[in-house]
Amino acid sequence: MCDTCGCGQGDVIPVEIRENLLAENDRAAAHNREHFHRHGVLAVNLMGSPGSGKTALLEATARAGGQRALAAVSGDLATDRDAERLRQAGIRSRSITTGSACHLDARLVHRALHGIELDGVDHFFIENVGNLVCPAIFDLGQTVSVVALAVTEGEDKPLKYPVMFQHVDLVVLTKLDLLPHLPGVSVDAYERSLRQVAPAVPLIGVSAVSGTGMQDWLSWLDARRVDIETAAASADPR
């Protein structure tokens, strides 16, 4: 399916080719990271399955965000529907149409950044292609990585896709408003599965519909932004 990571190739990709691909991506990611740092922006790589609620989470973030200035790029194989939804929500947004690629890479993000003004932006979201496998291994230059996991997906998702959950800074459990309609499903069950593969990764439960948990999510983002501001101040030789 994808020529850049080789997940759709029938033959095994030689290690040296894979390493070259990742090295090239890492160079572009370093450039993106410097770009975000220069603008004082918290960059969030938001990953998750198709239908996990990534776009709805960002829409709810805009509604609950008060004076926070938000911007985003949205990756999909086709259409710019998610980016248009974000624009309607008041988020500066551009779409990245990947064609057959099942994840974003740093070069795609870099090209999209040329069309977004970052001055004055507090939080910048990279809404990755819906996928729990390949996006985890590609550095995009983000400050933090987050995975959205819906309560409808099954509490064993962290066990089935451990690499994703071990590579993120936060799990956002979405669609909490559906819990009353899902017998036997609980936040605790998801938490137990997550702890088996990623004991230290925090989990925040939210509902984009009711607003439950949104302040916890915003507080987490704000704290990460303070972290980068503190680090920048410490690195300033003046």
Predicted segment positions?
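Long, basic/Gly/Ser/Thr-rich N-terminal segments
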Residues: M1-D11
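Hydrophobic residues at beta-strand termini and immediately following loops
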Residues: C5, I96, I204-V206
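Nucleotide-state-sensitive switch-loop elements of NTP-binding domains
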Residues: G10-E34, R38-M47, S52, A56, ...
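G-domain G4 guanine-recognition motif of GTPases
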Residues: S49-P50, V73, L77, A150-V151, ...
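Active-site segment flanking the S-adenosylmethionine/decSAM binding pocket
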Residues: V129, V147-A150
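Conserved C-terminal guanine-recognition region of P-loop GTPase G domains, centered on the G4
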Residues: P135-Q142, L149-A200
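Canonical P-loop GTPase G-domain recognition
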Residues: L179-A235
